[in-house]
């Protein structure tokens, strides 16, 4: 523990600068010394010597050098008493170290400060010198600044404890005296005195300010009374001024009342005159209606006459077709009867031919039996030839089938190649379309306006800018450039599908601006521009909830926004966006459009492009159209990126189709080569087949010739009859065929004529119905014409008997009012000019009767107020200003004083609180440290400090005291115990104060050897550990003090007898 403490002490000492420590003290003719110089170490210094050797004079000289008064040293009454007997002056010179961070003005004094005080019989002088001994200052303020800088208070017992102060404490058993010692040693006494002094000064200053403020209260009361009088007088003046103004207003109110009547009459005339064009418009409307109905009547009569002629001709034509149809039916019936008769005759001949053939067969069978052997050989040969023909025929058929199969494959290959070519064309067309869209989007990205009309709209906007003075209000457009989407670009394509060309339209405020804008459009070569006329002054429409479709799906109105309310109003009026609903897909859109028949629902648009709506009872669904990039997107970058990706996909599809086309061409060439080869093989097989068939035919002819050579007259006759009958059958069948063709033609003719007759009859029915309908319309037109003529006569009578007479009467009244206004203006101008009335502000619309009543009431009030006051308001104001000037400066000065006193009081309260807290902490610290030092001798103790009672009591318990009684008075201790406890108390105080050096004189008196040894060891350890410079003066032997490099011992010379 000792070693670790020594290491910590050494590290602290290395950081210590030693600034403010005493290097040496020189005295000349001071007390008992003629010339004495003592040098001190920076750490612990012991000075010993016999009584009378002048040890205590060193501390006295140190105190005198730092400005202490003679009584403060308790060694003399005046400073001149310190001059050695027989001398006329005394000099005390102290050299201080001045280096490190805590140095005092090192740039002036250097590393050493010399303080020299010269004392004479009549005066004293203090001089501060630098390290070279050169004089720097002789002012006491400089010395005081030096002392405060290093915190050197030689009157503080913790800095310099003289032998008198030590004895005073040792012999004091009074708790109040001990408290005074502690209070002074810890500088609490000094701070407390300063705070008390400040509080007294503040109290006195506050009382002075209160007294000064009381001196001006009578004047302030008088000022307050004057202020009330002035305020009342000002009100009287104000009433008089208002009375004059009201009189002037009354004069002009008659004029303004006539103006009001003139305005009302003018408005009445305007309204009456507005009835003229309205009435005339109705007359013109009815006149136009009459003329239109007359024209329609003329046309309808001509139409009825024409229809009558056409119906007559149609009846004749219908009768003609009816006769033709009857004739054709009769011809068809006659041909049918003849055809049936011929068919029966042919059938009879065929029956006779079959009987003859049976007879010939019987004869031939008999002949065949005779020539069976020869025929057997011929049949074998024929059979062989037939087999060969069959083989070749099979080969030819197989080759033909293979050829047809490959031809079909080649045909399919051509169709596939044509399909691929069509796909390539479609993909190329799609790619060109996407590239065009990308170029358009890039152009829109540069200028969004071009999305709604291209370059034409740019030219149009430039034309509008050139002609902007011709417009009553600047046109708004194109509408699409003023429309934004609220929640992203999700519904962009659906919104654009719904609004369509309305996005390209422009809005103007009236018809004149519409014509001007049309001229600008022609100038910009923008034909067919859609122009909407709408009142710009109308606020944004507020659509009630019950007027929109009740569905959770959004409407177009809910997903769009605009910086211009007119644009939204136009979209509501023109397109009904509040009734157009958006849906995610086809199924949801179908459920919304056709599910519940929602009220106020106009149309439903889906994300995939379907449009659904009702037209009467019919459900209508329009398929998606070709999708183009949306023009309403906030940013076109994403669309351009998607289209570029789509264009890249189309290019990949084109490349794949080109590769498939090449493969298809190669396959087609192979198939065509195979077809050519098969054709060649088939031609060879057909040649072989022809040869075999000719050979087989020749053999059959030979056999037939042999058979004919046989003598068979009966067979020949029968054959001739059969041939004759067959020829007749062929002749009759040919005739039947011709007859059948004639029958078909007759049937077709009859059917055609019958259909024409039916069609003609149906057409005639329509013509007759049209004729009847035209007659009904003609009657209705005649009735409407009579009604329109009656309405025209009615409005003409209103114009003649009502409108024009009312206007004439109103104009006569207007002229009378003008004359009356002129007279009233002349009378009012004599009272005051109209500009004076205008300067009072805008007219509030008061009538002459109201102003007359106000004037009467104000005259009565003014009369009452004038009776209460005798002084003039100017005199009152002069008195008020005089008194205000008299006390204004004083009041400001007193207020400033009070604010400063309050700030000082707040600061004093804050410092007093800090002082009490520090005093409480010092009390605890003193008890802990005192008990710690006592413990080194095995003694325990406690210090009780009462700031309220100003007492300090010490309790000490000795280790050998078996009774455990606590000694509460130092007089009850032995001399050594009292000296040791005094030392412990002093060390505790030392730890609580800071100073560059400390000095103690005769600290070990009345101590026994053991207490003295313990006290010296504790004192030396504390001094070395504490770090500041220490000076110990004792008359006793200090050989028992341990040797240390930081301990310096000096022996004073013995006194001369």
From Swiss-Prot:
Tissue specificity as recorded in UniProt: Expressed in seedlings, rosette leaves and floral buds.
Disruption phenotype: Delayed root growth in seedlings. Hypersensitivity to genotoxic stress such as UV-C, X-rays, methyl methanesulfonate (MMS) and mitomycin C (MMC).
Segments of this protein annotated with the region Disordered: 818-845
Gene name in the database record: SMC6B
Residues annotated for ATP binding in this entry: 49-56
One CC-aspect GO term: nucleus
Subunit organization: Forms a heterodimer with SMC5. The SMC5-SMC6 complex is composed of the SMC5 and SMC6 heterodimer attached via their hinge domain and from the non-SMC subunit NSE4A or NSE4B.
Function: Core component of the SMC5-SMC6 complex that promotes sister chromatid alignment after DNA damage and facilitates double-stranded DNA breaks (DSBs) repair via homologous recombination between sister chromatids.
Induction comment from the UniProt entry of this chain: By methyl methanesulfonate (MMS) treatment.
Zinc-hook domain segment(s): 22-1047
Name used for this protein in its record: Structural maintenance of chromosomes protein 6B
Family annotation (InterPro entries): P-loop_NTPase, Rad50/SbcC_AAA, SMC_hinge_sf
Keywords: ATP-binding, Chromosome, Coiled coil, DNA damage, DNA recombination, DNA repair, Nucleotide-binding, Nucleus
This protein's domain notes: The flexible hinge domain, which separates the large intramolecular coiled coil regions, allows the heterotypic interaction with the corresponding domain of SMC6, forming a V-shaped heterodimer.
Assigned protein family: Belongs to the SMC family. SMC6 subfamily.
GO BP, sorted A to Z: double-strand break repair; double-strand break repair via homologous recombination; response to X-ray; sister chromatid cohesion
Molecular-function GO terms, alphabetical: ATP binding; ATP hydrolysis activity
First-listed, main subcellular location of the protein, grouped into a coarse class: nucleus
UniProt key word DNA repair: yes
Domain of life: Eukaryota
Basic and acidic residues bias: start-end ranges: 818-828
Annotated organism of origin: Arabidopsis thaliana
Region (Flexible hinge): 449-632
Subcellular location: Nucleus; Chromosome
Residues forming coiled coils: 135-448, 633-904
């Amino acid at each position: 523990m000792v070693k670790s403490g020594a290491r910590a002490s050494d590290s602290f000492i290395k950081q210590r600068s030693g600034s403010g420590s005493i290097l040496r003290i020189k005295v000349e003719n001071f007390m008992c010394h003629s010339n004495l110089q003592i040098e001190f170490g920076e750490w612990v210094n012991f000075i010993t010597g016999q009584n009378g050797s002048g040890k205590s004079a060193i501390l006295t000289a140190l105190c005198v050098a730092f400005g202490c008064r003679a009584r403060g040293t308790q060694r003399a009454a005046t400073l001149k008493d310190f001059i050695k007997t027989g001398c006329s002056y005394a000099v005390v010179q102290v050299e201080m170290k001045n280096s490190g961070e805590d140095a005092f003005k090192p740039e002036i004094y250097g590393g050493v400060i010399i303080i020299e005080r010269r004392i004479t019989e009549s005066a004293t002088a203090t001089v501060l010198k630098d390290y070279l001994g050169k004089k720097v200052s002789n002012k006491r303020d400089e010395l005081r600044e030096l002392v405060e800088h290093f915190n050197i208070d030689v009157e503080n017992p913790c800095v310099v404890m003289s032998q008198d102060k030590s004895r005073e404490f040792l012999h004091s058993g009074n708790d109040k005296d001990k408290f005074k010692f502690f209070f002074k040693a810890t500088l609490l006494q000094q701070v407390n005195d300063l705070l008390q002094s400040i509080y007294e000064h503040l109290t006195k200053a506050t009382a002075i300010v209160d007294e000064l403020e009381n001196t001006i209260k009578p004047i302030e009361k008088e000022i307050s009374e004057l202020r009330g009088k002035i305020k009342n007088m000002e009100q009287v003046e104000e009433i008089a001024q208002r009375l004059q103004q009201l009189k002037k207003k009354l004069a002009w109110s008659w004029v303004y009342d006539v103006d009001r009547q003139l305005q009302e009459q003018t408005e009445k005339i305007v309204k009456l005159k507005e009835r003229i064009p309205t009435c005339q418009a109705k007359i013109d409307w009815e006149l136009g209606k009459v003329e239109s109905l007359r024209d329609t009547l003329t046309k309808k009569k001509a139409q009825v006459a024409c229809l009558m002629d056409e119906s007559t001709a149609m009846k004749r034509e219908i009768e003609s077709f009816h006769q033709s149809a009857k004739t054709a039916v009769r011809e068809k019936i006659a041909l049918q009867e003849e055809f049936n008769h011929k068919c029966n005759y042919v059938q009879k001949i065929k029956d006779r031919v079959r009987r003859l053939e049976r007879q010939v067969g019987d004869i031939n069978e008999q002949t065949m039996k005779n020539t069976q052997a020869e025929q057997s050989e011929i049949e074998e040969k024929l059979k062989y030839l037939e087999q060969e023909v069959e083989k070749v025929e099979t080969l030819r058929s197989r080759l033909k089938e293979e050829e047809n199969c490959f031809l079909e494959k080649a045909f399919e290959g051509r169709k596939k190649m044509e399909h691929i070519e069509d796909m390539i064309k479609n993909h190329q067309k799609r790619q060109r379309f996407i590239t065009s869209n990308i170029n358009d989007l890039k152009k829109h990205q540069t200028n969004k306006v071009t999305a709604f009309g291209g370059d034409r709209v740019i030219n149009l906007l430039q034309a509008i800018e050139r002609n902007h003075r011709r417009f009553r209000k600047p046109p708004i457009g194109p509408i699409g450039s003023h429309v934004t989407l609220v929640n992203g670009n999700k519904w962009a394509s659906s919104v654009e599908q719904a609004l369509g060309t309305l996005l390209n339209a422009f809005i103007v405020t009236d018809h004149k601006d519409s014509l001007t804008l049309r001229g600008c459009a022609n100038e910009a070569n923008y034909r067919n521009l859609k122009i909407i006329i709408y009142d710009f002054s109308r606020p944004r429409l507020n659509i009630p909830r019950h007027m929109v479709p009740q569905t959770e799906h959004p409407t177009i109105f809910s997903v769009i926004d605009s910086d211009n309310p007119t644009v939204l109003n136009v979209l509501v009026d023109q397109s009904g966006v509040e009734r157009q609903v958006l849906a995610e897909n086809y199924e949801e859109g179908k459920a919304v459009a056709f599910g519940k028949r929602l009220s106020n629902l106009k149309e439903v648009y889906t994300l995939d492009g379907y449009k659904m709506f009702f037209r009467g009872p019919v459900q209508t669904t329009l398929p998606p159209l070709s999708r183009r990039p949306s023009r309403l997107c906030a940013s076109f970058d994403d669309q351009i990126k998607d289209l570029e990706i789509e264009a890249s996909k189309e290019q990949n599809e084109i490349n794949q189709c080109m590769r498939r086309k090449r493969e298809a061409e190669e396959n087609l060439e192979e198939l065509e080569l195979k077809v050519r080869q098969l054709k060649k093989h088939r031609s060879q097989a057909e040649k072989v087949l022809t040869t075999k068939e000719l050979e087989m035919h020749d053999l059959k002819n030979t056999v037939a010739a042999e058979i004919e050579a046989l003598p068979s007259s009966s067979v020949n006759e029968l054959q001739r009859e059969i041939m004759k009958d067959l020829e007749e059958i062929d002749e009759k069948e040919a005739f039947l065929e011709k007859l059948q063709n004639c029958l078909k033609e007759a049937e077709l003719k009859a059917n055609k004529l019958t259909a024409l007759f039916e069609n003609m009859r149906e057409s005639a029915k329509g013509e007759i119905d049209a004729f009847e309908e035209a007659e009904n319309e003609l009657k209705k037109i005649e009735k409407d014409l009579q009604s329109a003529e009656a309405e025209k006569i009615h409005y003409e009578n209103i114009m003649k008997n009502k409108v024009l007479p009312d206007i004439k009467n109103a104009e006569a009244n207007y002229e009378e009012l003008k004359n009356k206004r002129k007279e009233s203006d002349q009378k009012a101008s004599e009272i005051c000019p109209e500009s004076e009335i205008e300067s009072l502000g805008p007219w509030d619309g008061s009538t002459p009767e109201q102003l007359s009543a106000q004037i009467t009431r104000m005259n009565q009030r003014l009369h009452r107020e004038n009776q209460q006051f005798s002084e003039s308001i100017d005199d009152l104001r002069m008195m008020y200003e005089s008194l205000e000037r008299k006390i204004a400066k004083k009041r400001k000065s007193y207020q400033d004083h009070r604010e400063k006193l309050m700030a000082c009081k707040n600061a004093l309260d804050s410092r007093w609180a800090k002082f009490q807290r520090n005093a409480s902490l010092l009390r605890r610290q003193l008890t802990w440290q005192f008990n710690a030092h006592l413990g080194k001798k095995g003694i325990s103790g406690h210090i009780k400090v009462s700031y309220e009672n100003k007492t300090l009591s010490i309790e000490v318990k000795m280790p050998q005291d078996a009774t455990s009684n606590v000694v509460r008075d130092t007089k009850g201790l032995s001399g050594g115990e009292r000296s040791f406890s005094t030392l412990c108390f002093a060390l505790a105080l030392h730890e609580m104060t800071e100073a560059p050096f400390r000095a103690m004189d005769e600290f070990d008196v009345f101590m026994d050897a053991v207490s003295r040894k313990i006290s010296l060891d504790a004192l030396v350890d504390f001094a070395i550990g504490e770090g500041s410079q220490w000076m110990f003066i004792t008359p006793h032997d200090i050989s028992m003090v341990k040797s240390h490099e930081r301990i310096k011992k000096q022996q004073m010379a013995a006194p001369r007898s």
